[in-house]
Amino acid sequence: MDKLLNKKIKVKQSNELTEAAYYLSLKAKRVLWLCLMQTYFTASVSEDDDEMAVLGDSTFKVKVADYQQIFQVSRNQAIKDVKEGVFELSRSAVIFYPKEGSFDCVARPWLTEAGSRSARGIWEIEFNHKLLRYIYGLTNQFTTYSLRDCGSLRNPRTIRLYESLAQFKSSGLWVTTHAWLNDRFLLPESQQKNLAELKRSFLDPALKQINEKTPLLAKYSIDDSGKFLFSIIDKQNPV
C-alpha cells in the first residue's frame, strides 16, 4: 500500500455508482473508496482511453492499517470506523431505475459477504456480482478524483457537493435548483426555506473547504430565475 500511496491515486466511480453512494455515511464511503482504489490497480486498463477493459475479482481486502494511514486517525478509531463502514454497506442496497427490462425499480444489495480477520486487521469484502460493472467503472461516464483529496474532507454534505461538482469538471459549469439541492443533500428545514441560511451554513463553508483542500476551484451565482450556476475549474488543468 505504501507504494500505491506514492502514486497519484485516483478513484473511479461510474456516475450511476456515485448517485447510489451519495447517502452512505462517511465511514462507509471511505471503505468503498479503499475498494475502488484497488479496482484502479487490478483491472486491465487501456493506455489509449484509460477505460477499464476487464473486470477483476469481486472480493476486496480492506486493511485497518491503510485506513489509519490514509485518513490520519488512530488505530482504535480505524478499527471502529472500518467495522461500522462494512456493516453499513452490508445492510444497504443500491436502487436503480432502469429504462429497459422487466422492472422500473431494482434494489441490489451492495455486498454478498463480509468477513473479518481481527488479528491481522483485515476485512474481506465480496461485492454483489451484479454491481461489478459499476464498481469497475465500465459505463461511458465516470467521476475521477483523488482519494487523498476526498479524504481531507470531513463533512458528508461537503463530500456530496464535491462529488457533484467533480461530475461537471470537464464542462466547467453545473446548473441546478434550490429544490434539487434540498432533495439531494437532505437539507434541514431552515436551509430549505431560507436561501440566505442555505448559503451561510452550507454552500459557502462547503465551497471554502473544497477550494482549499481539493483540486477543484468552484464558485456560484444565482440567476434571475433562481437557478444556481456553479463554475468549476480544475486547478491542475486550468483552461
From Swiss-Prot:
Q: Which InterPro entries match?
A: Initiator_Rep_WH1, WH-like_DNA-bd_sf, WH_DNA-bd_sf
Gene3D superfamilies (UniProt xref): Winged helix-like DNA-binding domain superfamily/Winged helix DNA-binding domain
Q: Does the keyword Hydrolase apply?
A: no
In this record, what's one Pfam family? Rep3_C
A single BP term in Gene Ontology: DNA replication initiation
What keyword terms does UniProt attach to this protein? Plasmid
* One Gene Ontology molecular-function label: DNA-directed DNA polymerase activity
User: What family classification does the UniProt entry report for this protein?
Assistant: Belongs to the initiator RepB protein family.
| UniProt protein name | Uncharacterized 27.6 kDa protein
Organism per entry: Escherichia coli
